[in-house]
Amino acid sequence: MSVPLSAYLVFALMLFCIGLYGALTKRNTVIVLICIELMLNAVNVNLVAFSKYGMNPGITGQVFSLFTITVAAAEAAVGLAILIALYRNRKTIHIDEVDSMKR
C-alpha cells in the first residue's frame, strides 16, 4: 500500500509552517536557526515526494535533496560559528539585544 502524494505535501506543509512560526516568533537565535533547518527539511520532503510521484519518476529529487542537506549543514555550521562569536563579544544570543552592528 502506497502513501498518497497529498499526505507528503500536508506533512511538508505542517513542517514548513511550524518552522516559519518559530523563525518569526522566537527570540533565541539558536531556536531560529533550528526552525530554518526545519523549513529546509520540509523542502526536502517535497523534493523527494515529487520525485517519486512526478511525471517522470527518477532520482532527481533525491539528488537535489542531498544537495539541500549539504547546503543546510554548511549553513548550520556557519550560523553556529557566528553565534559563538556573537556570544563571546556580547554575552547574549537573543535577537532583540544583538540587532545592531555596534559594539
Curated annotation (Swiss-Prot):
It is an enzyme of class 7 (translocase). Gene3D superfamilies: 1.10.287.3510. GO terms for biological process: ATP synthesis coupled electron transport. One of its GO terms (molecular function) is NADH:ubiquinone reductase (non-electrogenic) activity. InterPro entries: NADH_UbQ_OxRdtase_chain4L/K, NUOK/Mnh_C1-like. Belongs to the complex I subunit 4L family. This is NADH-quinone oxidoreductase subunit K. It comes from Anoxybacillus flavithermus (strain DSM 21510 / WK1). The lineage of its organism: Bacteria, Bacillati, Bacillota, Bacilli, Bacillales.
